[in-house]
Amino acid sequence: MDRIIEKLDHGWWVVSHEQKLWLPKGELPYGEAANFDLVGQRALQIGEWQGEPVWLIQQQRRYDMGSVRQVIDLDVGLFQLAGRGVQLAEFYRSHKYCGYCGHEMYPSKTEWAMLCSHCRERYYPQIAPCIIVAIRRDDSILLAQHTRHRNGVHTVLAGFVEVGETLEQAVAREVMEESGIKVKHLRYVTSQPWPFPQSLMTAFMAEYDSGDIVIDPKELLEANWYRYDDLPLLPPPGTVARRLIEDTVAMCRAEYE
């Protein structure tokens, strides 16, 4: 699936190492390989964006290595491809040896997988399913400031799905653990790959059922009900959290205006 990059190869370049992304001038590189000193590197095409190939190169650059969060304002499709590249690079880096027998592994030529040369075990990139849910109570939405977001951003509740748990059960558990309330009328909305580090966000909307807000201080700094026309600082556009909030606001406007 991979090949050596030549001088006239062009497209978008995802150069990644240890979950970092090469961002010269703070941007995802685009153009001919020769312009970025990438000729001769081994690359894997991981998709296309607006008719141009998107290449993954597993390489550590001395300067300008940053987080994929820095390109979150890109078009959603290109951001997802950048996230795919970072996740694949880390997968290949962390699966050089078989977890069963310890022998060296090699990449599959037909799919994104690593194969053991000894016991023939096959490994795929790990994906961690998560839930994220917007909770509405009359004309208000529950928004929280997470301990990991100390920049004033308020967002909806989210968490990882546990082993042996349905998505619906995960929503009920996470909401109760983080905020102390119960929800009802759960409705699936959409999903979004989220490379922090390898999540798949499954988005829901729900209605408040019962209980008072009691936050988990290990997870949240605060949580409150906010009227739809008086909201705090929100996640950036393009995130599934922002979509859930905007969808909830639209529902409130339709009912209360």
Swiss-Prot record:
Domain Nudix hydrolase: 125-248
Cofactor: Mg(2+); Mn(2+); Zn(2+)
GO biological process: NAD catabolic process; NADH metabolic process; NADP catabolic process
Binding site for a divalent metal cation 1: 158, 178, 219
Sequence positions that bind substrate: 25, 69, 111, 124, 192-199, 241
Residues annotated to bind a divalent metal cation 3: 174, 178, 219
SUPFAM superfamilies the UniProt entry points to: Nudix (SSF55811)
Residues that coordinate or bind a divalent metal cation 2: 174
Position of sequence motif Nudix box: 159-180
Record's keyword annotation contains Transmembrane: no
Keyword terms of this UniProt record: Hydrolase, Magnesium, Manganese, Metal-binding, NAD, Zinc
GO molecular function (one): manganese ion binding
Signal sequence, renumbered to the chain: none
EC number, as in UniProt: 3.6.1.-, 3.6.1.22
Sequence similarity: Belongs to the Nudix hydrolase family. NudC subfamily.
Oligomer and partners: Homodimer.
Function (record text): mRNA decapping enzyme that specifically removes the nicotinamide adenine dinucleotide (NAD) cap from a subset of mRNAs by hydrolyzing the diphosphate linkage to produce nicotinamide mononucleotide (NMN) and 5' monophosphate mRNA. The NAD-cap is present at the 5'-end of some mRNAs and stabilizes RNA against 5'-processing. Has preference for mRNAs with a 5'-end purine. Catalyzes the hydrolysis of a broad range of dinucleotide pyrophosphates.
Name of this chain's protein: NAD-capped RNA hydrolase NudC
UniProt organism field: Escherichia coli O157:H7
Gene label: nudC
